[in-house]
């Protein structure tokens, strides 16, 4: 696992952040899930796979899986929520999530089938195949794919998108269209549904790459969400956008407004230095070629200066 993946997993695993993602994505910002009501689950998923005619046990690892309690109208409801972190499009994500969820459901069936060995003879006969009794229910499983990227999520979000276009409609109609939930920053219409630094992440990644430095500076200069950002979130923003902002070590919170100003000033200073060096080289070339009379014009006229750069091979 890369450093960036490790940072994102640690960030999302935090109960406060995890609850915020669940409330923001599933409940549109309503605070129905509390951090203290989350319970870490084993994220190892085991399944069988045929390899060269041999049945082998395979393991897959979710990024994060937690048991979630939903508190509503004095009632508690339960669900399992997994979060998968992605920094790039994964075109097989639908199949991967479908496998994870299916394994979780089968684990529940296996657990329930072993739960009550004292069931009546009638119950044992009626459930002898699966061990799963009539009337029993499963805890819902939801997987949220959190995309830490500056572009649009371009991968399929449903099983039908993975199937050939040439399939007859009659066949497609018989195949359940398994869909996944993707949190993509550029698609977040209302960042206020998030109450933690996840909001700053969605805003920053929606602006994009370091090439959009002026937009990024404007965002962070004017948005109070960036006055105090979780240092892990700041690190994620910095890595994904490749901005090169200096994140102070051993600080829980980072003032990204100040950090981006320093970053912007350094870029300007670097650009000025490079520009001065380049122009000095141009002046030298113009003098050597007997074109010194146009030096002042090159200094005053940006269009003419660009022509001179091109003429003397500095473009």
What are these regions (language model features)?
Residues 1-315:
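Elongated, amphipathic alpha-helical interaction scaffolds
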């Amino acid at each position: 696992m890369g450093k960036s993946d490790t940072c994102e997993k640690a960030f999302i695993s935090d109960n406060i952040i995890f609850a915020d993602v669940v409330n923001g994505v599933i409940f549109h910002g309503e605070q129905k899930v509390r951090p203290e009501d989350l319970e870490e689950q084993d994220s190892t998923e085991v399944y069988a796979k045929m390899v060269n005619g041999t049945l082998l046990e395979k393991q897959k690892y979710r990024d994060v899986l937690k048991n979630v309690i939903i508190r509503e109208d004095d009632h508690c409801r339960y669900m399992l929520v997994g979060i998968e972190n992605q920094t790039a499009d994964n075109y097989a994500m639908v199949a991967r999530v479908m496998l994870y969820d299916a394994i979780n459901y089968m684990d529940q069936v296996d657990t329930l089938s072993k739960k009550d060995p004292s069931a009546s003879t009638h119950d044992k006969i009626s459930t002898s195949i699966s061990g799963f009794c009539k009337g029993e229910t499963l805890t819902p499983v939801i997987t949220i794919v959190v995309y830490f990227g500056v572009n649009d999520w371009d991968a399929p979000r449903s099983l039908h998108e993975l199937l050939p276009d040439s399939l007859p409609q009659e066949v497609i109609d018989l195949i359940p269209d398994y869909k996944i939930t993707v949190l993509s920053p550029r698609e977040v219409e209302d960042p206020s549904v998030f109450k933690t630094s996840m909001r700053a992440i969605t805003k920053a990644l929606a602006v994009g790459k370091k090439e959009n430095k002026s937009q990024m500076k404007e965002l962070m200069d004017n948005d109070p969400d960036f006055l105090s950002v979780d240092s892990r979130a700041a690190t994620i923003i910095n890595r994904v956008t490749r901005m090169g902002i200096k994140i102070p070590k051993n600080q829980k919170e980072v003032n990204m407004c100040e950090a981006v100003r320093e970053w912007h000033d350094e870029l300007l200073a670097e650009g000025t230095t490079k520009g001065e060096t380049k122009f000095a080289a141009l002046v030298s070339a113009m003098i050597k070629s007997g074109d010194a009379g146009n030096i002042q014009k090159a200094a005053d006229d940006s269009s003419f200066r660009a022509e001179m750069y091109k003429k003397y091979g500095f473009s």
